[in-house]
């Protein structure tokens, strides 16, 4: 196999992350279109680290951030994900990471639903200071292997579940396979990753595993996140009443579902997303820094922040920098990365 180096990325801006993800996906899946949105949910300066390691028909990634992040992406037909977090030591704070509605702990594997819908979206919350491992498998090869093994339980879980908690030999071996790869013991047979992933899903022991199934609540959260992100072409931000009408759900139900996952109501989530959209607009290098400074107040108004002084205070409390400092810092955005010998392809 042709060896490819690991690629290390360090980001301090969500726009950088989005552009890198889109480019990386398009390159790996030969021009396939892909869209994603990243929103910082906690306050403070953002620092993230990512290591990507492509292998034939497998894409491995390890990601960490000092801030909690909401990550939304389009469901696709190219790959299926298996994600887990680095195990926590006893006495360490509880993980806040949620993958597609499945609350993660050291025995969790989730992310299957990115392949199970057409025209939908998938969302994750990466908890601050958690380390997330993600293995994406090419779906066509995965499907062929499932069929050849008659792994009907695995297929059913992909369709019905968004995550499982289990501690089996296959789940342990899968995690160790990926961790060893990042530690220099390269995956030489990608088929092993497919077989171990299928084995994790094929286990059907209700006494030892806990699963989160698709539900009206998880679907509602997906719809809320997608709806808030949609560009309304200069219209005022979508209201709770409009969301309620569009999703045919009561305001109480919407807020209850939102608080259960994000610990905030729908309007607070919308404010966080809109604030992040302003930061991305102020960071956009397709416009000169001078023009971004000149139009900063209009940019804030476009995303629903009509009172500039109040917006400035909120912006600083959220990101520990002023809008002007964001523009200056992103005058020339450079993705910081280094390469070292690593994965196969």
Regions found by a protein language model. Give the residues of each.
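DNA major-groove recognition helix of helix-turn-helix
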Residues: 258, 266, 270, 314-315, ...
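Conserved short histidine dyad/triad with adjacent acidic residue
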Residues: 45, 50, 58-76, 119
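Glycine- and acidic-residue-biased ligand/ion/polar-headgroup-sensing regions
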Residues: 65-98, 107
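Alpha-helical bundle regulatory/interaction domains
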Residues: 2-43, 89-233, 239-241, 245-251, ...
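Short, charge-rich binding segments
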Residues: 51-54, 72-76, 83, 102, ...
């Amino acid at each position: 196999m042709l060896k490819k180096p690991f690629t290390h990325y360090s980001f301090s801006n969500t726009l950088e992350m989005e552009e890198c993800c889109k480019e990386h996906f398009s390159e790996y899946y030969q021009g396939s279109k892909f869209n994603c949105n990243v929103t910082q949910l906690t306050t403070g300066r953002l620092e993230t680290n990512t290591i990507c390691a492509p292998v034939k028909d497998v894409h491995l990634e390890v990601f960490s951030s000092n801030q909690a992040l909401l990550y939304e992406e389009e469901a696709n037909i190219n790959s299926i994900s298996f994600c887990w977090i680095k195990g926590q030591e006893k006495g360490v704070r509880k993980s806040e990471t949620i993958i597609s509605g499945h609350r993660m702990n050291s025995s969790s594997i989730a992310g299957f639903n990115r392949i199970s819908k057409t025209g939908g979206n998938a969302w994750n919350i990466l908890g601050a200071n958690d380390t997330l491992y993600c293995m994406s498998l090419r779906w066509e090869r995965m499907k062929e292997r499932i069929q050849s093994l008659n792994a009907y339980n695995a297929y059913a879980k992909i369709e019905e579940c968004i995550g499982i908690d289990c501690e089996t030999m296959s789940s342990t071996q899968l995690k160790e396979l990926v961790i060893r790869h990042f530690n220099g013991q390269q995956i030489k047979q990608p088929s092993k990753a497919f077989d171990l992933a299928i084995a994790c899903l094929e286990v059907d022991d209700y006494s030892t595993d806990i699963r989160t199934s698709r539900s009206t609540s998880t679907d509602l959260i997906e719809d809320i996140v997608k709806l808030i992100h949609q560009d309304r072409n200069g219209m005022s931000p979508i209201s709770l009443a409009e969301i309620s009408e569009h999703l045919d759900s009561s305001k109480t139900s919407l807020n209850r579902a939102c608080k259960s996952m994000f610990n905030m109501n729908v309007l607070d989530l919308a404010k966080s997303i809109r604030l992040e959209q302003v930061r991305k607009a102020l960071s956009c290098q397709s416009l000169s820094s001078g023009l971004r400074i000149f139009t900063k107040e209009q940019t804030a108004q476009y995303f629903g922040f009509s009172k500039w002084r109040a917006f400035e205070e909120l912006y600083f409390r959220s990101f520990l920098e002023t809008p002007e400092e964001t523009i200056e810092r992103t005058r020339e955005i450079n993705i910081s990365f280094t390469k070292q010998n690593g994965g196969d392809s």
